[in-house]
């Protein structure tokens, strides 16, 4: 839940920009929200505010009943999974697949010895990807393709199911076939763990087809919030007319 959250960048200068303007929202557990809006609408700023990349100027951020407004990002990272558009940003390229997964599994703790049981768990998590990564556990992640890295990052972000999963155009940099594969994987992981998720997308058709709720943002506000039956009647043209 967000209550009257605001964020202004470069205040008092010619480059001043109000990125979030008294924004409030309330998610129910298990909500899968797609978020659309023009560039500069505040979508990524919203995610960064929730993750603690920067502190907000005013307002409250509450996660699972806990006020996290002033918590540092590394504390929030134990409860929030975050995938970016760039497949290279969610993994450590010089470390192996196994080491990356062990680090993700430790939720911010330091890398320790990986037990046989953990190795088998990692393989089990990777198998559904159908990318053969479970047989390449000792390969550096830097050798993987963008799609493989993004799929791995998604598994890593949900290895300990987070309270909230944030997906910032996480398939935008992938070719259409790989993007569809990662999107299908996303849907199955969210359904399997009954995750609460927010996903930024520029694909309006996907925004209406995925999840149960859609936000449209503009100038740091949520200007439209539709869900369930009401949303199912909407077309892309309806969204474009707003």
Language-model region placement:
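Conserved ABC transporter NBD signature motif
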Residues: 59-66, 126, 224-226
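H-loop/switch region of ABC-family ATPase nucleotide-binding domains
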Residues: 201-202
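ABC ATPase C-loop
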Residues: 157-158
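ABC ATPase NBD coupling module
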Residues: 55, 67-81, 111-115, 231-237
């Amino acid at each position: 839940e967000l209550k009257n959250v605001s964020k202004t960048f470069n205040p008092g200068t010619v480059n001043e920009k109000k990125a979030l303007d008294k924004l409030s929202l309330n998610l129910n557990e298990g909500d899968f929200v797609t978020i659309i809006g023009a560039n500069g609408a505040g979508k990524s700023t919203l995610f960064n505010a929730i993750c603690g990349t920067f502190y907000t100027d005013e307002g409250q951020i509450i996660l699972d009943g806990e006020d996290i407004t002033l918590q540092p990002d590394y504390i929030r990272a134990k409860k929030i999974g975050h995938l970016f558009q760039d497949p290279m940003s969610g993994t450590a390229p010089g470390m192996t697949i196994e080491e990356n997964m062990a680090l993700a599994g430790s939720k911010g703790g330091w890398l320790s010895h990986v037990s046989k049981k953990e190795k088998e768990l990692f393989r089990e998590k990777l198998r559904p990807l159908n990318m053969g990564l479970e047989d390449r556990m000792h390969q550096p992640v830097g050798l993987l393709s963008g799609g493989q890295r993004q799929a791995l990052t998604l598994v890593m972000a949900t290895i300990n199911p987070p309270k909230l999963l944030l997906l910032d155009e996480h398939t935008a940099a992938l070719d259409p076939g790989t993007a569809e594969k990662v999107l299908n994987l996303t849907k199955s992981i969210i359904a399997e763990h009954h995750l609460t998720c927010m996903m930024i997308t520029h694909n309006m058709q996907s925004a209406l087809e995925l999840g149960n709720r859609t936000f449209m943002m503009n100038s740091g506000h949520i200007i439209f919030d539709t869900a369930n039956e009401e949303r199912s009647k909407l077309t892309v043209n309806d969204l474009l007319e707003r």
